[in-house]
Every structure is written in structure tokens, then in C-alpha cells.
């Protein structure tokens, strides 16, 4: 009588937490790992997979994905959910999409991945245009949480708020128990090293924030690239108890290239990249 539901055989089992790194068999019962041994009899399992030459790792947690509104391409929702599952992620946080788009995508193409989302703050769409009072900011954050979001996403490189508004969004979300992710940049700074330099002032002594893709602010637009990297690392090291961050690993990355009526790009992100390639 088989003891296990599934046996994954001959894979290189890697687990950073326990320090395991060896070729082993992994036996699974009721969706949970039952045994990890150098060799397990295939006859003891209902099914088996030979994964020789491949890695067997715990599911990854990706804290910065876009699987909600980004799935609008082709009018098909949920494509990103399939992609993150194929990449080995089991838990992801969508940094900037509507809960409606998220739930529609899960219903259409859910891949079994655990998904949480942050409400994105876009003037004229999810927040009022113009300057925002403290009461309005509290209402915006509260509405995002009530809709099912884990918190909010500040897209400073695309839709910047004033430094005071940015700081107040962060502190309000902190006080309401919401998660805050921040693509750096305000009306006074850009999506560059200067925006990152502003973070300690925005947080004060108690603010907490997730700084999105920190390497995006180290492209060499203010200092040489290596100098910007060193300064960025110094900034987040000094804010170790208040800040978490991550990097985007692909060389190309998505940006919003929308222009005004005169052909000028609207997003600071795109403007920075064009200037670095000597475009005017």
C-alpha cells in the first residue's frame, strides 16, 4: 500500500532556511512534505516525478509583481498569475492594481498562488486631483483597506504627491495597519537618487515603508552608477528598522510612455531614461 501521494525523485533539494543542499527524494502527502531522504522507494508513492538535473526549492515569495491591471493587454485578465506560478512563486504582492481587476483575474486564470494587492494612488482615478487634506488622505487609505487591499502603493515616479502628502500617506497607512509601498519621488524630487535621499525625512523616526525596486534609482542620472549604488545601500542600511526593499532582476523594465499634446513624456521615469541615452 503506497504511503505517499507524490514522490519527487533525484532533484537537488535547496532550502536556505535549513541549509539543505543535496540531491534527495522528496515525499509528499496531503499537500505537505512528509520525508526528505537520499533515496525513497518509488513503490511507496501513488505517483512520482524524476527531476534529475533540476532544483527542488520552497515556493518563492515575490513582494513586487504586477498581475492585476497589467493583465488588460489583450483584454485577458490573470495572465500574470500564470507567469508567476511558472516562475516558482507561491505568494505574491501586487504593487498597484484595483481589487476588481485582481479578483476578476483570479476567477479567470487563478493558478493557486496566494495573492495580496495594494491600492494604487492615481490622481483623477483613485484619488481626487489637486492637493489633499489629512482627512481626505485618511479616507483614501481607509477605502483601500475596506476594498480588500493590504495597503497602498505610492507611484512617485509617475504620479507624485507633495512631500507632505507623501509623508502623510505613509504615516496614515502605518497607523491604520496597512502596508505601504513607495516608488520614490515627490513633486520636489524625482525617481532617482534624490528621491531616495528624501525618504528619511518622509519617514521621520517611526515611519515604515517598502521601497520598490531600489536599483531603479541607481541609473547614474546624478552620480556615477557605482557611487549611486553605494549611497543607496547606505541609506537603506541606516533605515534598516523602518524600510524593506527589493530589486527588479531583468535589464529591461516596463514604464508608462504617455506623452502630452506637445509630445513631452509625462512620467519622470521615462524622462530619466531618455536623458541617460542623450535624447532631449
Describe every region a protein language model picked out.
Residues 145, 150-151, 208, 213-280:
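Active-site neighborhoods of metal-dependent hydrolases
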Residues 65, 76-159, 171-178, 252:
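Divalent-metal coordination cores built from histidine and acidic residues
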Residues 69-71, 123-126, 130, 158-161, ...:
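Short, small-residue-enriched loops and turns at beta-alpha junctions
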Residues 150-206, 220-224, 259-262:
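Divalent metal-binding pocket/active-site signature
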Residues 11, 31, 53, 64, ...:
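Divalent metal-coordination and catalytic microenvironments
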Residues 94, 154-157, 182, 211-214, ...:
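Conserved beta-strand positions
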Amino acid at each position: 500500500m503506497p504511503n505517499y501521494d507524490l514522490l519527487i525523485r533525484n532533484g537537488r533539494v535547496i532550502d536556505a532556511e535549513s541549509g539543505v543542499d543535496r540531491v534527495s527524494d522528496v515525499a509528499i502527502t496531503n499537500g505537505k512534505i512528509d520525508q526528505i531522504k537520499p533515496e525513497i522507494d518509488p513503490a511507496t508513492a501513488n505517483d512520482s516525478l524524476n527531476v534529475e538535473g533540476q532544483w527542488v526549492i520552497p515556493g518563492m515569495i515575490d513582494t513586487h509583481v504586477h498581475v492585476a491591471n497589467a493583465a488588460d493587454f489583450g483584454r485577458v485578465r490573470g495572465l500574470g498569475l500564470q507567469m508567476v506560478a511558472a516562475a516558482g512563486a507561491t505568494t505574491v504582492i501586487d504593487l498597484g492594481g484595483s481589487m476588481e481587476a485582481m479578483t476578476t483575474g483570479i476567477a479567470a486564470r487563478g493558478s493557486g498562488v496566494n495573492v495580496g494587492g495594494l491600492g494604487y494612488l492615481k490622481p483623477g482615478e483613485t484619488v481626487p486631483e489637486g492637493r489633499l487634506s489629512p482627512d481626505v488622505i485618511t479616507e483614501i487609505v481607509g477605502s483601500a483597506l475596506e476594498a480588500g487591499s493590504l495597503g497602498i502603493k505610492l507611484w512617485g515616479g509617475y504620479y507624485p504627491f507633495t512631500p507632505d502628502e507623501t509623508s502623510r500617506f505613509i504615516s496614515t497607512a502605518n497607523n491604520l495597519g496597512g502596508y505601504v509601498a513607495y516608488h520614490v519621488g515627490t513633486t520636489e524630487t524625482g525617481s532617482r537618487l534624490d528621491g531616495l535621499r528624501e525618504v528619511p525625512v518622509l519617514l521621520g523616526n517611526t515611519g515604515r515603508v517598502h521601497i520598490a525596486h531600489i536599483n531603479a534609482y541607481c541609473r547614474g542620472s546624478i552620480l556615477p552608477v557605482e557611487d549611486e549604488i553605494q549611497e543607496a545601500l547606505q541609506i537603506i542600511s541606516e533605515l534598516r528598522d523602518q524600510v524593506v526593499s527589493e530589486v527588479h532582476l531583468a535589464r529591461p523594465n516596463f514604464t508608462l510612455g504617455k506623452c502630452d499634446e506637445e509630445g513631452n513624456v509625462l512620467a519622470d521615469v521615462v524622462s530619466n531614461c531618455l536623458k541617460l541615452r542623450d535624447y532631449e
